[in-house]
Amino acid sequence: RMIHAMIDLETLSTNPEAVILTVGGVKFDPYNTIEPSQGMYFRVDVDSQTAKGRDVMQDTLDWWATQPKEISDEALGDKDRISLEEMIKTINKWSVGVDVFWCQGPLFDYAILQNIYKQLGHPVPWQYWQIRDSRTLFSLVPKDPNEQRTGMHNALEDCYFQAKKVQKIYKQLNIK
């Protein structure tokens, strides 16, 4: 079986040059309902990114100000932030053996990661043809009115939720 991974970023901008706040990831098998596992989650040092000219948008700061306190505190708090080099090492190590890389809108998460990898002079740990978009898949089925959602905008919880939803839709569409 191929290994699928879901990645999600929380950022301070919607541009490819965005400052990254947090990175989340889970590995999963879309062909069954086994719990997503091998979670990856960390917070990235903001000052080193702004020093490199990475983007912060006022609209995004304003948006963060509207989020529940526990969500914005987790994303914006100062504790336990890792360097950009450490971020790249962590993502690269976690990505070993992954065949398919999912996210909700590749022009966001993977565009930002690709941009920062290039800025730091590193190749990305995926090929363009390995990228999948959960948003496209989700648009193929009617929205579930009973869908319960917690922890939105926590990068790890978003990944878990999106991976579970991919599994559910593969089953619904009888994708084998």
Briefly describe each language-model feature range.
Residues 10-12, 26, 105-106, 111, ...:
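Anionic group-transfer/hydrolysis microenvironments
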Residues 16-18, 141, 166:
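Short, function-defining helix-loop hinge/capping sites that tune catalysis or transport
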Residues 1-2:
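Short, Lys/Arg-enriched N-terminal segments with co-localized hydrophobic residues
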Residues 125-145:
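Short, flexible loop segments at boundaries between secondary-structure elements
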Residues 5, 10-103:
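Conserved non-catalytic scaffold segment of RNase H-like nuclease domains
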Residues 92-95, 107-128:
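Substrate-recognition/cap helix-loop segment adjacent to the acidic, metal-dependent catalytic center
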Residues 90-93, 111, 115, 139, ...:
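Residue-level signal for well-ordered alpha-helical scaffold segments within enzymatic catalytic domains
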Residues 100-106, 111-112, 144-176:
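Acidic, Mg2+-coordinating catalytic module of metal-dependent nucleases/exonucleases
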